[in-house]
UniProtKB/Swiss-Prot annotation:
Protein name: Aquaporin PIP1-5
Motif (NPA 1): 116-118
Source species of the chain: Zea mays (Maize)
Superkingdom classification of source: Eukaryota
Record Gene3D superfamilies: Glycerol uptake facilitator protein (1.20.1080.10)
UniProt entry tagged with the keyword Ubl conjugation: no
Induction text: By nitrate in roots. Expressed in roots with a circadian rhythm showing an increase at the end of the night period, a peak during the first part of the light period and then a decrease.
Chain location of the short sequence motif NPA 2 per the record: 237-239
């Protein structure tokens, strides 16, 4: 019984040296930074752990809520003939960014607050979590996104189908290359922000500055949406794009769908490489 309680207490943060999203790094007893051990590729014992499934449920619920609120916001803008009468692009961007801020804050201590297969993929490449957990998270994120978009359609089917269902696509006037580039760079910004905001190295260097990781992550999502909504409607989250595409299920949603998987995964991989090879490889020793 004691072992189970300890397992639940640790939750997703089974490796105490690694820093979950949304929490401040600890370890002020020793100022010199120590490289945390990498996560194992496979960890069979995770499959028997309640914390493993609890984390997956948290990812499902968070992605469900993310799609529900954000797609509803898109529908509210789409149903009006005058964008001045709605929250407009800025409001959509705030909806996406604000929800990520809130949901990362809520789920950080349970699952790490990924809510995005691209973020999970980037953290996996950086050996922050096992392949077992990464695949489980991605499945739960996609299922949550499908359910979230499905509930929006259930409430407002006519508007949902008439307004494109919030599905991502390359907008007229832009090429597929433009869309792919926007997704790569946008996801790089997001995943790089995730790495930077949650790097335990900040504990040794900036221990006097409290950091709330969800804030810069949500703000990054907001800014990327402002920049790329006119190009692709902003994906940077394969689960978000898949959920809207499956529920809308028209050719418009599938023609360019590959862009919203390939682009985010390339962007996440580049951010992981940059963080691990360039940023984390620099010699570091804090001042006494």
């Amino acid at each position: 019984m004691e072992g189970k309680e300890e397992d639940v207490r640790l939750g997703a943060n089974r490796y105490s040296e690694r820093q979950p999203i949304g929490t401040a790094a600890q370890g002020t007893e020793e100022k010199d930074y120590k490289e945390p051990p990498p996560a194992p590729l496979f960890e069979a014992e995770e499959l028997t752990s309640w914390s493993f499934y609890r984390a997956g449920i948290a990812e499902f619920v968070a992605t469900f809520l993310f799609l529900y609120i954000s797609i509803l916001t898109v529908m509210g803008v789409s149903k009006s003939s005058s964008k001045c009468a709605t929250v407009g692009i800025q409001g959509i961007a705030w909806s996406f960014g604000g929800m990520i801020f809130a949901l990362v804050y809520c789920t950080a201590g349970i699952s790490g607050g990924h809510i995005n297969p691209a973020v999970t993929f980037g953290l996996f490449l950086a050996r922050k979590l096992s392949l077992t957990r990464a695949l489980f998270y991605m499945v739960m994120q996609c299922l949550g996104a499908i359910c979230g978009a499905g509930v929006v359609k259930g409430f407002q089917e006519g508007l949902y189908m008439g307004a494109g269902g919030g599905a991502n696509a390359v907008n007229p006037g832009y090429t597929k290359g433009d869309g792919l580039g926007a997704e790569i760079v946008g996801t790089f910004v997001l995943v790089y922000t995730v790495f930077s905001a949650t790097d335990a190295k900040r504990s040794a260097r900036d221990s006097h500055v409290p950091i709330l990781a969800p804030l810069p992550i949500g703000f990054a999502v907001f800014l990327v949406h402002l920049a790329t909504i006119p190009i692709t409607g902003t994906g940077i989250n394969p689960a978000r794009s898949l959920g809207a595409a499956i529920v809308y299920n028209r050719s418009h949603a599938w023609n360019d769908h590959w862009i919203f998987w390939v682009g985010p995964f390339i962007g996440a991989a580049l951010a992981a490489i940059y963080h691990v090879v360039i940023i984390r490889a620099l010699p570091f020793k804090s001042r006494d």
